[in-house]
UniProtKB/Swiss-Prot annotation:
The lineage of its organism: Eukaryota, Viridiplantae, Streptophyta, Embryophyta, Tracheophyta. NCBIfam families: rpsE_bact. This is Small ribosomal subunit protein uS5c. The gene is rps5. Residues 152-215 form the S5 DRBM domain. GO terms for molecular function: mRNA binding; rRNA binding; structural constituent of ribosome.
Length: 308
């Protein structure tokens, strides 16, 4: 029967196989916390690193000094500087300004001129108009329009729908012809276009006020002499009439004469029946008329000698 031989490891071999490796390597220099002046360093790795110097400073070496004029126990207070001569303290938010409203208005007028009052020679918003007011109450706005009160009456001669053909289609708008006058010798014809009838009439009224002319008339409210004029294909003939005759004319010619204040006159359309051209032809015929006094002054003779 065979026997089995077993070997028992010795203590030396176990120590060699199972050697304990320390977690942190041992330092080559002992750590000392004594109050020596020699610097110490602490190394936690096997690699060489620069030492960290630790110095011990005695508390008695620190000297705390104070200025002779300062007292640490005294409370510190701040004295503001003195106010210069002529210093005016700022006013509070709720206090009124030092100047009155009249002084402020005069200073504003000296710098920027007179403020816009909203009124012009021919009414408000005709020649001068603020941009914000024009945007709020301009043409096409939904706000209520204020009628211009300047002594002129308005008469709509014609309102038609016009079409502009473009590449993308047709643009349809309304064209209005308006005659304005004060029936005292002032009359004007204007044209306006807009997407709405009301806006077109308002534009035409403003345009007519910008083209006001003076009509020469005698004391019998008629023309001083006969005259003819044409505008485009329209031709208009005007003749003076005796008192009590009235205005014998038709279409746009009659409207222009009535708004000008003519009460006795004869008018006739000889060419085209276009309302705008006939109205403008009437304006041209009236503009070329002259008073007797103007003719006598140009000739250098008294007015009584004109009929000799």
């Amino acid at each position: 029967m065979a026997t089995t031989a077993t070997t028992t490891p010795s203590a030396t071999s176990l120590t060699t196989l199972h050697r304990r490796i320390p977690l942190f390597p041992t330092t080559t220099t002992l750590l000392s916390l004594s109050s020596s002046s020699k610097p110490l360093f602490l190394s936690l790795s096997s690699t060489r690193s620069f030492p960290t110097h630790l110095y011990c400073i005695k508390k008695d070496d620190i000297d705390i000094t104070f200025f002779e004029q300062d007292n640490p126990d005294e409370e510190i207070t701040f004295d503001p500087p003195e106010k210069p001569e002529g210093y005016i303290p700022p006013r509070a938010v709720d206090e009124p300004p030092f100047e009155s409203e009249e002084e402020i208005a005069l200073a504003y007028e000296e710098l920027y001129g007179a403020a816009y009052s909203g009124e012009s020679l021919l009414g408000n918003d005709v020649y001068a108009m603020d941009s914000k007011i024009k945007k709020a109450t301009g043409f096409g706005s939904k706000s209520k329009k204020e009628k211009i009160r300047d002594g002129f009456e308005e008469n709509v001669v014609q309102v038609r729908r016009v079409t502009k053909v473009v590449k993308g289609g047709k643009h349809m708008r309304f064209r209005a012809i308006v005659v304005v006058g004060d029936k005292k010798g002032q009359v004007g014809v204007g044209v306006g276009k807009a997407k709405e009838v009301v806006s077109a009439v308002q534009k035409a009224a403003v345009d007519a006020r910008r083209n006001i002319i003076t009509v020469p008339m005698t004391k019998y409210l008629t023309f001083p002499h006969r005259n003819e004029a044409d505008y485009g294909a329209a031709r208009v003939m005007l003749r003076p009439a005796a008192p009590g005759t009235g205005v014998i004319a038709g279409g746009a010619v009659r409207t222009v004469l009535e708004m000008a204040g003519v009460e006795n006159a004869l008018g006739k359309q000889l060419g085209s029946n276009n309302a705008l051209n006939n109205a403008r032809a009437t304006i041209v015929a009236v503009q070329t008329m002259r008073q007797f006094s103007d003719v006598a002054r140009d000739r250098g003779i008294p007015m009584e000698e004109l009929w000799k």
